[in-house]
Design a protein with these regions (language model features):
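Hydrophobic h-region of N-terminal signal peptides that target proteins for export
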Residues: 1-9
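Short S/T/G/P-rich N-terminal loop/turn motif that feeds into the first structured element of a domain
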Residues: 8-92, 96-234
Length: 234
């Protein structure tokens, strides 16, 4: 069974913070202990649509260890309520938590993006365990052509594929000519093994059938991450 591409309305705003943790396990535990409850409460009160933490897999040389994603409804953004107030915490208590987490990690980057399109296998109505984030930089003057081509060429996902989903995003915000990436695609998998098995197959030339992606965009980075925490978790 094949599910057709769905072009998503411009209602979601993704705010992504890239983190470099000194002690990864300590940071993982700190997030679970102090932040998961706060952001689940924000979701339940409608201040966030979703909150997810992704952890880089098997790539110690990567320049970040985690990606924290806040998904907002643009119609309700921003909200002014402090997250800690919803849990009855004082400003001092919140400040202490922030001081501790700042000693564990560094915020190395923050970017926002919006939806352009997606494709899913039938029955994939959940957040998968594995995300493959592809950071793309569009060629000068080719943004419109690239976006149309990306959507056109991922209209569906074959039922035999190890991939269960795909998303396409446009980076937004204030950045200059020296931007590292302008777009992102995400490939979703149910397990790391499924992702690895996707590499077992015959490769083709980039110019097969007269089309070359390199004329429209450059793949700057591909990072595999696993789900650590999500507000969708039961």
């Amino acid at each position: 069974m094949i599910v057709p591409l769905v072009t998503i309305g411009q209602t979601k705003l993704y705010d992504n913070v890239f983190i470099k943790a000194d002690d990864v396990n300590a940071y993982d535990n700190f997030l679970k202990e102090h932040y998961a409850k706060i952001h689940k409460e924000r979701v339940s009160q409608g201040m966030l649509l979703q909150w997810d933490v992704w952890k880089v897999v098997d790539t110690p040389q990567e320049d970040f260890t985690h990606m924290v994603t806040y998904i907002y409804d643009i119609e309700k953004y921003p909200n002014q309520a402090a997250p800690y107030e919803m849990l009855g915490m004082s400003n001092l208590q919140w400040g202490t938590i922030q001081k501790k987490v700042n000693q564990m990690r560094e915020r190395v980057a923050q970017v926002k993006w919006i939806d352009l399109g997606s494709a899913r296998k039938k029955g994939m109505d959940y957040l998968p365990e594995i995300m493959v984030l592809n950071m793309m930089k569009v060629k000068d003057g080719k943004a419109g052509s690239y976006e149309k081509e990306e959507i056109k060429r991922t209209k569906s996902i074959n039922n035999n594929s190890t991939r269960v989903g795909w998303n396409f995003h446009r980076r937004i915000g204030e950045y200059g000519n020296d931007v590292y990436f302008t777009h992102a695609t995400i490939d979703w998998f149910d397990s790391y093994k499924d992702y690895l098995q996707g590499w077992y197959g015959e490769w083709s030339d980039s110019t097969e059938q007269g089309f070359n992606w390199n004329e429209l965009r450059e793949l700057k980075k591909m990072v595999v991450m696993k789900k650590l925490i999500s507000s969708t978790d039961q």
